Amino acid sequence: MLLLSYFSDDTGNISLVRLKHFVGIVNIMKFENILYDNIGKLALITINRVQKHNAISLSTLEELNQAVEIAADDENVRVLAITGAGGKAFAAGADLNEVVDRDLRKALDPIIQGLALKLERTPKPTLAAIDGFCMGGGLEVALGCDLRIATHQSKFATPEGKLGIIPGGGATARLPRIVGRGWGMEMLIMGEAIDAKRALQIGLITRLVDQDQLLPEVIRIAEHLSELAPFVPRTMKAMVHFGMDSSLSGALMLEKYAQGALIQTEDKKEGLNAFLEKRKPVFKGK
């Protein structure tokens, strides 16, 4: 479908992938800073630097990019989620030890901004499962996801101003678009942390759960999304992102063309027939 070409093809060939089966979970190894698990149709990527509060080093960033590419390229994966290990932090930001000597050339590299863009442009739905601190670059990774789910103990901030810099991973552009200009400016300029309740109120997150319910909720959402016709979530993503960056009239026109394209699919016929016959649809992505 031409209108789905809005998403760039960032997938690549990944080698040295080894599968390990354990209690229904498939674990893809060969990573040092992250974990990659398949749970049904869900690809769960876990930042695993607990002693560093899951701070995102350059090597961690490289692995995250690889993991997203693996999930995007895997036909068995329908939903992608990112979380943090340890129960105290999603990601406390970039690894500051690597920021100290960062020069202009390095500052202009995509770094976290590139990962967030990759998550945003991946046709498959992406979730950020947040438990604990979600700060700086960690928040910017979460902002690149389609949905953000958090536990009650989670806190959010863009504290870069206290370090004499500004966010460089996309927060100045994405945060105001997600929470509005007022709260976007509040969080960016003040740099103060907000709690999960406030994050829910302003739309930074859309679901708030107890800590022991975070993974079950992510799995439940993934199962729900996996039951949809494959073209639906990817087209919905394309429409929303295009609509946010275009005129209302242009977005409405493209929506009509997108609807027209989906109406011609076999999945549309299956969906309507299943509804009329009061049965569960069997979508094939055709």
Predicted features and spans:
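Conserved CoA-thioester-binding segment of acyl-CoA-metabolizing enzymes
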Residues: 14, 26-83, 117
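Aromatic (phenylalanine/tyrosine) cluster motif
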Residues: 6-7, 22
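Glycine- (often His-adjacent) and acidic-residue-rich active-site loop
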Residues: 69, 84-118, 134, 162, ...
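Terminal peptide-recognition signature
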Residues: 45, 49, 64, 82, ...
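C-terminal alpha-helix plus adjacent terminal tail
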Residues: 21-40, 74-75, 87, 191-197, ...
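Crotonase-fold acyl-CoA enzyme core
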Residues: 117-233, 257, 261-265, 270-273, ...
